[in-house]
């Protein structure tokens, strides 16, 4: 499968989620990735942490790490979904070298 790239994504969410809501949120986004032909999807909750500075009036946030493989052309749609989600404070997507 040529053109497949491995990605590692870290997402910072508002602290408003309890554990079950956080799992549901992560599951929904993993399903979106799957619908965009992503594979090897793994979701890891990194817990709630204090932030070094305020972001959108938030001093704490929940961190989620998502690893997946996908073709780069599908990434733009996923990024736009994240940008419009009011619960997402920040996110970073990195190419993961094999």
Regions of interest found by a model, annotated:
Residues 1-61, 69-98:
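Long, contiguous binding/interaction regions
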């Amino acid at each position: 499968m040529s053109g497949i790239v491995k990605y590692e994504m870290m997402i910072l969410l508002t602290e408003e989620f309890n554990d079950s809501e956080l799992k549901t949120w992560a599951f929904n986004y993993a399903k979106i990735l799957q619908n965009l032909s992503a594979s090897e999807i793994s979701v890891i909750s990194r817990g709630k942490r204090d932030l070094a500075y305020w972001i959108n009036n938030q001093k704490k946030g929940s961190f989620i790490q998502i690893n997946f493989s996908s073709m780069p052309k599908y990434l733009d749609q996923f990024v736009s979904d994240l940008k419009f989600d009011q619960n997402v404070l920040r996110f970073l997507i990195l190419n993961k070298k094999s």
